[in-house]
Amino acid sequence: HELIHFQQKYDGGNLLAACIKEGAADFLAELISGRHINQHVHDFANPHEAELWAEFKQRMHGKDYTGWLYSNTPGRPNDLGYWMGYKITKAYYDKQPNKQAAVQDILNIKNFDRFLEASGYGK
């Protein structure tokens, strides 16, 4: 995960960008290793995906990461934003016919709104 961050050519910003940065690192680490590093977060979030997406959509352009990244929130696991970014990144990767190009795209995102749109996630 941390080695992926070294390869990423972008910084965080709003919640969407920060979550994609973290989730892309998780996704690419899984692609390399074959294992989730945050399985407990996936186990919690997958059954609540629709509700979490609705909540995330309302906040994704803000800079308040509370409840999503780098904080403790009662009733939910830490770092749900990693999971959300993972889901968006995986959706993008799965849609791309050229997987090598998709990895390069993921490492070099310039516009996070366009990346989300291209992923088709949440549609």
Language model features with spans:
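A structural motif
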Residues: 1-3, 21, 58
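Active-site recognition of the HExxH zinc-binding catalytic motif
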Residues: 1-10, 26
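Amphipathic alpha-helical segments in well-ordered regions
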Residues: 2, 28, 87-91
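A generic structural signal for ordered alpha-helices
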Residues: 3-4, 34, 46-47, 63, ...
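General secondary-structure propensity
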Residues: 9-15, 71-72
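Post-HExxH zinc-binding segment in Zn-dependent metallohydrolases
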Residues: 12-55
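Pan-zinc metallopeptidase signature
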Residues: 57-123
